[in-house]
Every structure is written in C-alpha cells, then in structure tokens.
C-alpha cells in the first residue's frame, strides 16, 4: 500500500509531454512504472544497443548466405543457388531499418538513464513475432520471419537489461501458439547466454537440434483438396529442450491451480460444451462457395478467392488469404456482417440463436438473480463507437404484461445495423 507507483496514461506519452515523462521516471525513485504495451516502444533504447543488434543482424544475414553458397557448391542438384542481388538488398534493408530507428530516437533520455532494473511484461505472447534469419526454404510452420517492430523494440530492451545484469519476467498463458519457433524466440528474449553456450544462436542450428520437418498431406487454403507440405511441426530431443525451458520457466498448470483452490475453475454444465448447430442459408452457401459442374466454384465466393490467392505474394490493395478468412468468419456469424441490408432469418442466424439461448437462461434464473457471460469475437462495439444507455423505462409497470419473446424479437431487429467495418451500431438512446 505504501509503494511509490507511476501509472502512465496516454496523456503522459504524447509528443509534447514525453520528455517530461522520461525525466520524471529518471529523477524519481519509483517502485514501479506501469505502462501499456502500445507505449513501451516510446521509451527510447540506448544507441549502442541498437547499433549492436544492427551489426549482429548483418553478420547473421552474411552467415546464412555463406551457408547457402557452401550447400549449393557441395550439392548443386539438391540446393538452389543463392541470389546475390537479393542478399545485398537484404543488407541494405537491415541498415535502413536501424538507421530509421536511430533517427527516430532523437535526443530523448533512454532506458539506461531511467534506473530500470526489472522489466515485467504481461501477455508476453503479443511480442512473439521476433525477426530471424534462416536458410530453410519452402518450409511451413516457421512463423513470421520478418517480425514486428513491437517485438524488435522489446528485444532491444531485453538485450540492454541482460548486458547490465538486470531482471526480466514474461507472463503468458500461451508461450507457444502458432509455431515451434516461438520457443526459440522465448529463449532469445530470456536466456540468450544459454543459446550462445550451446552454439544455438542461429535458428537453423536450434531447429536441427530441437525440431523436425515433417512431410505430410494437408488441406490447401480452400479446404477442398490436399497437397504435400513440408512443415516444421515436431520437437526432437524433448528432454533436452524441456530442461532448458524449465531452467527459466515457472510453469503453473491447471492442476496446480486446483490444488490451491478446487473451485477456481467453474465446472462445465454437463461436463462438456453444448454445441448449437444453426442451418446454413442459401446466401451463405453461395458466399462460401458452391461446386460447379466443371469442378470449380462460383465466381467471387470464398473458395474461389482463396484458390486465386494460392501461391501469390500479398500486394497492397489486392485480395489475400487474411481478407478471405475474415469474410468467412463474418458470414459464419451473421450474413448481415457482409450485407447490412440482408433480412434476418431466425433459422439461419447464430446471433439470433445465441440471443434466444441467453434469454431462455435468463427466464430460468432471474428469480435467483442468475448471471451470464456472453463472449463474441466479431461485431462488438469499440470504444469510439456509439454508447448503449440502459435506463429504467417510465412504463416499467407495463413490461410485466408484454410477451417476452416479442420483445426479444424487437430487440434483435433493432440491433441489425452495422457500420462499414462490420461493427454493430448500437441503438440510440431515443
């Protein structure tokens, strides 16, 4: 209760106030400074740390190129000749990226002057897209090799902290979500010295030691046919990797939680989820894709679009796989997210089925003031959207005599308007 804590909000981190904040952190003896993920990048990194990572990435790129040249020289039939022009362009890109970072830093006070001795990152999986070099080609499951600016910035901060014997703590429930390479990145963040001691700084060396490429048939992006895929998807030497991981990880399992509090995780009704299946309308079927006699799918459908995107590089403004899957998610929820003017048909609407289910549960439990939690991943109001105002109506006495199902239908109809981004526009207060 007596801790001296600074909570940074968006007003403190504006360009006008930023320098004041940096001085405030540097010149006060705070026990903790709490800052949002989105603001962390605005805390400058030491120039020597940035220069050091720049040189390391250049050396890594050169090493990978030399390995590719040697592999081609030893076995030209099995290995592709490395593209020297592409290699030089990569070096230029790395230099340009770090020069831009240094220029953006300006003359701000950096974290080395702020007295930071412990960095604790909640939801650390949001920083998993750390850039890396690899000579592995046409291998799925490697993750995002380009990385993100957010991850690179955090990596710069962890490098500074490691070099100065400071502390780092990551908190996450999903250390590995999409790719085995995320374990490698976690080790780069938290135990870089352990990787160096074992000669595993390069991803390729780490992957050969702890991973395995599996060849198998997989559904293509359209989910209509199979293709052979080489995927980095299997751990090897699990015992050795587990020992490295447990050297820095404090693992809390669901069983551990239940030992301390047997009722912490509520029991699922019926011991398993209840799947509510809603029939697909003709509009949704056409939008997803209907097979034609020639084996193709109707023009403009999701499957048709995904087949056309297969194997193509994403270009700005053009259709891509992510856009297709986003549209597929929208139409799977409610066709009105695709066509706001479409008529709501009860038997084909998941949102209607959900609302009806929630209302039925309400009728069963309202006498004991039962509580429900509803989760929906699409078409939810954002902070900048219209606010919903719930007030006790003047005619409260009349509500007792109304038909609850009719009211539910009217409520659903009133929520049938969406903005251009597919977000629900709440009914006005009037």
State the predicted function of each range:
Residues 133-148:
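A mobile, often basic/glycine-rich helix-loop segment
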């Amino acid at each position: 209760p007596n801790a001296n804590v600074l909570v940074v909000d968006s007003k403190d981190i504006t360009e006008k106030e930023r320098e004041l904040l940096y001085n405030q952190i540097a010149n006060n003896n705070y026990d903790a400074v709490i800052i949002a993920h989105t603001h962390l990048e605005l805390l400058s990194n030491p120039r020597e740390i940035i220069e050091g990572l720049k040189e390391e990435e250049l050396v890594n790129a050169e090493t990978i190129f030399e390995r590719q040249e040697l592999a081609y020289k030893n076995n030209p039939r099995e290995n592709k000749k490395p593209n020297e022009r592409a290699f030089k362009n990569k070096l230029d890109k790395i230099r340009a990226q770090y020069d831009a970072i240094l220029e953006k830093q300006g003359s701000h006070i950096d974290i080395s002057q702020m007295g930071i001795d412990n960095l604790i990152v909640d939801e650390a999986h949001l920083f998993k897209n750390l850039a890396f070099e690899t000579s592995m080609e046409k291998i799925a499951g490697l993750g995002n090799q380009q990385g993100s600016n957010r991850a690179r910035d955090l990596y710069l901060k962890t490098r500074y902290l490691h070099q100065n014997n400071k502390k780092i703590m990551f908190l996450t429930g999903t250390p590995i979500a999409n790719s085995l390479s995320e374990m490698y990145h976690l080790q780069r963040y938290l135990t870089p010295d352990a990787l160096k001691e074992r000669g595993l700084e390069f991803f390729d060396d780490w992957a050969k030691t702890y991973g395995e490429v599996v060849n198998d048939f997989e559904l293509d992006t359209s989910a209509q046919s199979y293709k052979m895929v080489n995927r980095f998807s299997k751990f090897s030497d699990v015992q050795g990797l587990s020992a490295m991981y447990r050297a820095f990880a404090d693992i809390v399992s669901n069983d551990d939680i239940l030992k301390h509090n047997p009722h912490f995780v509520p029991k699922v009704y019926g011991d398993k989820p209840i799947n509510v299946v809603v029939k697909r309308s003709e509009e949704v079927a056409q939008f997803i894709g209907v097979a034609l006699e020639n084996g193709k799918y109707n023009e403009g459908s999701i499957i048709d679009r995904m087949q056309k995107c297969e194997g193509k590089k994403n270009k700005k403004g053009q259709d891509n796989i992510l856009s297709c899957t986003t549209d597929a998610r929208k139409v799977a929820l409610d066709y009105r997210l695709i066509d706001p003017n479409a008529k709501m048909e009860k038997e084909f609407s998941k949102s209607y089925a959900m609302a009806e289910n929630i209302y039925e549960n309400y009728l069963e439990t309202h006498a004991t003031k039962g509580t429900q939690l509803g989760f929906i991943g699409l078409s939810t109001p954002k902070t900048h959207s219209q606010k919903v105002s719930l007030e006790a109506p003047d005619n409260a006495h009349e509500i007792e005599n109304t038909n609850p199902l009719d009211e539910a239908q009217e409520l659903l109809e009133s929520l049938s308007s969406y903005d251009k981004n597919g977000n629900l526009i709440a009914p006005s207060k009037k």
